[in-house]
Amino acid sequence: MTMEFSNPPDAEIRAILARPSTVAVVGCSDSPARDSLRIAKLLKSRGFRVIPVNPQLEAGALRDVLGEDCYPDLASIPGPVEIVDVFRRPEFVPDIVEDAIAKGARVLWCQLGVIHLEAARRANQAGMTVVMDRCPAIEYARLF
């Protein structure tokens, strides 16, 4: 049985992007050449508090760039996270969803090419808004 998935309507995506909040960028790289860091910097420039999540980076690796420590996982982040932006391969998404649910996140945003229907269903069942296979930079350009 295949699950149908539709991203939220444009008005809802616009509302997510128009209201700066705390976003955890899972899979954030410290390389300026990587999309994950470029998107993290864009979100920061739009007023979001951006928390990098990458177990392979030192805590202070992105402090100068994003103003926040890097954490190995969502559970390690002190305080609430509203949006979880995923820059990991699809097979990692189910575990990220479980961590996001435990953290109380309200939005799961999976980047271009990151699609996992069962994880999206689980996130929706937990009350999360799910955006998949979309990039915030492209959505900003398209909706604002």
Task: Identify the function of each model-found stretch.
Residues 1-19:
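Short N-terminal or domain-adjacent regulatory/targeting segments
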Residues 92-111:
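Rossmann-fold NAD(P) dinucleotide-binding segment
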Residues 112-140:
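Rossmann-fold NAD(P)-binding glycine/threonine-rich loop
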Residues 46-48, 103-108, 126-128:
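A short helix->loop->beta-strand "cap" motif at the edges of active sites that frequently abuts
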Residues 33-34, 41-63:
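NAD(P)-binding Rossmann-fold cofactor-contacting core
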Residues 3-9, 62-79, 85-94:
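Glycine-rich, highly charged phosphate/nucleotide-binding loops
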Residues 61-64, 81-82, 118-121, 139-144:
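Short, charged, surface-exposed secondary-structure boundary motifs
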